[in-house]
Regions:
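Catalytic cores of the polymerase beta-like nucleotidyltransferase superfamily
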Residues: 1-357
């Protein structure tokens, strides 16, 4: 198959200099290397990419040998992280081949079979994410019509949607995220397949789904994301204890406003919002007198959080903060004037106050 090679223009100031250096170093060492995926998609749309990924024909061991400050990570997908500081690294992946190892349910459990650039294209999820940028020629290499789909604002799956979702059900979540982020349409076959295969999310480890949930809701269009998850039947496989409510939508609106204003949003706020109704219900069910005791509320919180972690992992620090937010609601609603100063000085006060209002 002959790809389209198209010279493209975008603001070169948005290119990460370290990522370009990595590509140039790999080329100098005799390998092929390209910037690939979401960073190219975002650059062509005029967005500043959050991450820059690189694909190469060098094996992880060869990449590691080329860069002193690097490490090989992963079992399911072996990657190389090239370190530039304590907080910054550039991720390099070797071209994947079409052959993969799957579980009985069809989920890819190992994808460390290496191939060519063309092989790698057809291991990617959507056409708009299968664009490779050659830093030498300033051309984008496109095997699957991704450039045209990007212009048309349409998300298309590479390959059969059902088979690709069976390989990796997280692709359904990614499809929703890109649909909202790019204000795009999903091709009909892709859209229908998400609704049909939503149950496959149960095959994904809760720890991996946690990372995807953070990506879904830490943006300025979280209400649209929530609605799409509901429409496709995905929400119940992420937050089975969560129901649609005006409270949730108001909280997500607050989240969007904070992000648009350049303020940060903690995952604890999102999880506390989504699980608040389930927590409240558990408190009511287990309260023996009119006013719930602190231990009753703690037990209710732990019950709800334990159920949630069966679907999406909540790290210990996150579950602790969520409990703090919930318990502080009762303190805020029944605040003794003598204890106001102590309450306001609590490090969780701002999150709890935003939650209350």
């Amino acid at each position: 198959m002959t790809p389209v090679r198209q010279t493209v223009k975008f603001d070169k100031k948005l290119l990460d200099k370290d990522a370009v250096k990595v590509v140039q170093s790999l080329i100098k060492a005799g390998y092929d290397a390209y910037l690939v995926g979401g960073c190219i998609r975002d650059l062509l749309l005029g967005y500043e990419p959050k991450d820059f990924d690189i694909a190469t024909n060098a094996t992880p061991e060869q990449v590691h040998k080329t860069f002193k400050r690097s490490r090989i990570i992963g079992r399911r997908f072996r990657l190389v992280h090239i370190m530039f500081s304590a907080r910054k690294f550039i991720e390099v992946a070797t071209f994947r081949a079409g052959m993969v190892k799957t579980s009985n349910s069809g989920v890819v459990v190992r994808d460390n079979f290496y191939g060519s650039l063309q092989d790698d294209v057809f291991r990617r999820d959507f056409t708009v994410n299968a664009l490779y940028y050659d830093v030498v020629s300033s051309q984008v290499i496109d095997y699957v019509g991704g450039l045209d789909d990007l212009k048309a604002a349409e998300i298309k799956m590479i390959g059969n949607p059902k088979e690709r979702f069976e390989e990796d059900p997280v692709r359904m979540i990614r499809a929703v995220r890109f649909k909202v982020k790019l204000s795009a349409l999903l091709e009909p076959g892709l859209s229908n397949s998400i609704s049909t295969n939503a149950h496959l999310l149960a095959n994904i480890p809760p720890a991996r789904l946690y990372e995807e949930v953070i990506k879904l809701f830490h943006n300025d269009n979280s209400i649209e994301v929530f609605n799409e998850l509901l429409n496709f039947g995905l929400l119940k496989h992420l937050f089975s204890q969560t129901k649609e409510s005006l409270f949730i939508k108001a909280a997500l609106e607050n989240t969007s406003k904070r992000i648009k204003s350049g303020n940060s949003v903690t995952p604890a706020f999102i999880f506390a919002v989504f699980l608040w109704s389930a927590f409240n219900l558990r408190v009511v069910v287990t309260t023996k007198k009119n006013k719930p005791r602190v231990d009753t509320m703690i037990n209710a919180a732990e019950f709800v959080i334990k159920n949630q972690t069966q679907q999406v992992m909540m790290p210990r620090w996150l579950s602790t903060r969520v409990k703090d937010i919930w318990l502080m609601q009762y303190q805020l609603e029944n605040c003794n004037p003598k204890k106001e100063r102590d309450l306001i000085s609590n490090p969780r006060f701002r999150m709890a106050y935003d939650f209350l209002v």
